[in-house]
Amino acid sequence: MSRGLSSPARWSLWLVSLALLCAAAATRLHLHTVVDTDILAMLPPQQESAAVGAAIEQSRQAFVDEVLILVSGDDETVARRAAVAAADVAATAGLEPDDSGRSMDRLLAVYQKHRYALLDDAAAARLAQGGAPALATDVATSLASPAGMVDAFGSDPGGHLSHFLTDLPQPYPGFLPDGAFFSAQKDGKYWFLIRDRVSAAAFAEGGAQGTRAVTEARAAVAKVCVRCDFAATGAPLFADAARHAAQTESIWLSLASSLLIMVLIAYVFRSFAPHVLAGAQLLASVLAATAAVILVFGSIQVITLVFGTTLIGIAIDYAFLYFAEYWFGDGAPEQVMAAVRPGLYMGLATGVVAFAFLLLAGFPALTQFAVFSVAGLVEAGLMVVLIFPVSLREFPQVPLHPAVLWPQRFIQAACRRSRWRLVLPLAALLLCIPGWLMLHPSDDVRGLQNLPPQMLATDAHIRETLGQVPPPGFFLSQAPDLQQALRQEEVLFDRVAAGAPGYTSLGLSRFLPSDARQQASLAAWRQVFADRQALRAAFVHFGLPKELADRSLAEWQAADHASLTADEVSAAAPDLKTFSISAGAGATLLSTVTGRSDVDSATLAGYAAATPGMSFVDPLGRIAATFQRLRERATWLVILGYLLISALLVWRYGRREALRMLYPPLLALGLTLGVLGWLGEPLNIFVVVALILILGLGRDYAVFLREGGATRRSPALAVTLSALTMLFSFGLLAVSSIPALHVFGIATLVGILASYLSAPLSLPPTERA
């Protein structure tokens, strides 16, 4: 149908179709969210309660915003001045200081007011059972120790309030609240911890803000104290370092691959036209693919741009097929389209079918990949059909040269009947068997990150100094009301303390005992102070003055006997609100357990399972499980897609030839997996995407050669140029320092080489001349 269209009609049809697609996408466009950088949004929605979702987001936000600055020195006064300078500069740079230290001072006043409601279960039971003699015993024991002689509040002779305060969880063991800091004296040095949060809304902006603030704070400390040590860590700092490394790497990799491809095209075709047409095809394909995704989803994920553009790399095969036939084929320019049409249409059909199957994945990531790739491939094919014939009309004036001839010679030599056509692939597959056995899946997102070793060492040093390792997850206590939720959390913490005394529990119940526990505490004190004479006698029995008994009784009578409430605690320490999750009816509390070393998730999950109303959530584990399902589903969909492609090939070429054409891409797939296993590389979703690319290229090579035959040089040249450009584009990623791109690059490097070298196996063997 397109053969009879005039040149203006072809240009109009192509431009109008592209413009209509872009205009339709513009109606769905949100200017502030054109490119979405939240990778987690690419994961499918979890089948979870609103409380779990809110808790995951709240804990994630607390982690990604925190910046820790640690200043230390031999002289306390100078080190403190340096820490003050660092805190001031960080605040000026936009970081928000943490208020935990000052919150503790306000909490102390609240606890003093409600001190009679703060006994733990064991102390309350002992006083309730022992009465006045039990209190006298506590007072005598307390006063017998040097620390007990110091009555900080003038109303705690038995040390019961002091015991409660001492038992409060310390975020950083050995570090105590000290105004705006947490401070400690250890290893002959004075340490000051500054806790800040980035204030920028966007994650990337927060990383830049945190890095800038830390740099300025480091300089401020150096001015005040040359001999003081400075260290900082936090997710924003790691994110900014990773972003800078990725930007630098992407620039030089892009420049290197672009330069190599331009030199290759210029050397082979000796013309500027291929650069213009191939570049226009790529731009139009990316534009159409992006518009299609925005039209369907309203925005496009940055990871879709990266990997979708990678998959559209297959589309340049269509351009090379046309260029090779036009410049070095046997027919006139007007006959080029007729010569390449069968291979072009068959390659386009099989490619669209393969990627369209990903639409059935049910995963936002794969669905976007599919829409992007299908739209891009269709646009690339449309441009070849409509624009290339009217842009390349004159006979090319480029003579044949060795770079044009050797691909055909290689294909012809590889197609000659020989036992090596059977022996070499079998030998390669036998060598791959140990590699297949060594393959191991890895869906942990931490293994995909490029974290600078120096920053990791600094982070480990800070965590070791603070005696705190970030928890692997968190607990949720869900109940109809707050009091039941607090009680469930108390039961869990008691179980953890009994089974793992080295762990530190951190939750609202550690700062706000449940009302049941508080009422038991108040009842115990009522029992103690029920009989004035018995109280006096008990004190005198231990050699204590009866006036001390009278004072204790008077303080009890004058004290507030009401329970401590959540509102009072939250007003004194607003940070404690992070332990409460607002999601629907009832009450939900978030809590964690930390230790000086890594805490085992399975152990914590076991404690939660043994406590009614409690659950343990491992966010990283959930993400890893989602990536695993994503990888497995993508693999099965690719298999189903290839079964359908097999049917198309059987319909076009017959069963025998279809099997012959499927052999090279499947052989390349097996070789790629074998090499990955030998190298110890993990099998993850990025490897699956690379395998999709490899299968697509291998399929195109087989179709192009089958339609062109071994006796024509243009199909062989097109396949060779495609392989070389793919190696330049994606094989270079093998040297990337980013693990995800590194394994993707290795897979594509091996797979493309294997696809090209095995492509002649798609043709029937020929007899030697």
Indicate where each model-derived feature is located.
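Signature of alpha-helical transmembrane segments and their immediate interfacial
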Residues: 1-37, 389-445, 760
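Juxtamembrane segments of multi-pass membrane proteins
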Residues: 420-541
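Transmembrane alpha-helices and their membrane-interface boundaries in multi-pass membrane transporters
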Residues: 295, 305, 311-327, 341, ...
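Hydrophobic transmembrane alpha-helices and their membrane-interface caps
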Residues: 275-321, 658-702, 731
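Extracytoplasmic
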Residues: 103-267, 271-272, 508-650
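Pore- and gate-forming transmembrane helices of large, multi-pass membrane proteins
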Residues: 329-361, 708-737
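Solvent-exposed, non-transmembrane loop/terminal regulatory segments of multi-pass membrane proteins
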Residues: 27-74, 172-181, 321, 419-422, ...
